[in-house]
């Protein structure tokens, strides 16, 4: 499984449909797509949400991003993430 950071920005539609139950629906959908939500944070700044998810790969991440955007009205920007320990190993190989 690979780790992905999904940064969410609320749209007007997303604000109208906001509810505590939506969080569980997001967790369920990610699980249905073969992944796991490790954490969800509400954040201040240019983005409103941060999801830390484990997914099988880039295709699953794209599908999750598109599916969650369509389902919630939240606009997502998704980036792969690598644990710093793995990054340090890569540096040692350069």
Residue ranges of predicted features:
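A generic structural signal for short, solvent-exposed coil/turn residues
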Residues: 29, 43, 68-70
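A short linear hydrophobic-aromatic micro-motif
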Residues: 34-41, 76-78
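Short S/T/G/P-rich N-terminal loop/turn motif that feeds into the first structured element of a domain
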Residues: 1-25, 31-32, 36, 44-47, ...
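Hydrophobic alpha-helical elements and their junctions with loops/disorder across both membrane
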Residues: 15, 37, 68-72
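Short, well-ordered beta-strand segments in beta-rich or mixed alpha/beta enzyme
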Residues: 4-8, 41-66
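An amphipathic, aromatic/His-enriched active-site/gating alpha helix that lines ligand/cofactor pockets
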Residues: 55-85
């Amino acid at each position: 499984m690979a780790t992905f950071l999904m940064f969410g920005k609320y749209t007007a539609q997303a604000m109208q449909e906001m509810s505590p139950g939506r969080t569980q629906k997001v967790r369920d959908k990610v699980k249905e797509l073969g992944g796991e939500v490790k954490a969800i944070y509400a954040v201040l700044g240019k983005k409103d949400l941060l999801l830390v998810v484990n997914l099988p790969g880039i295709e699953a991440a794209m599908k999750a991003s598109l599916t969650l955007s369509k389902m919630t009205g939240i606009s997502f920007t998704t980036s792969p993430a690598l644990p710093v320990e793995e990054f340090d190993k890569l540096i040692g190989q350069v």
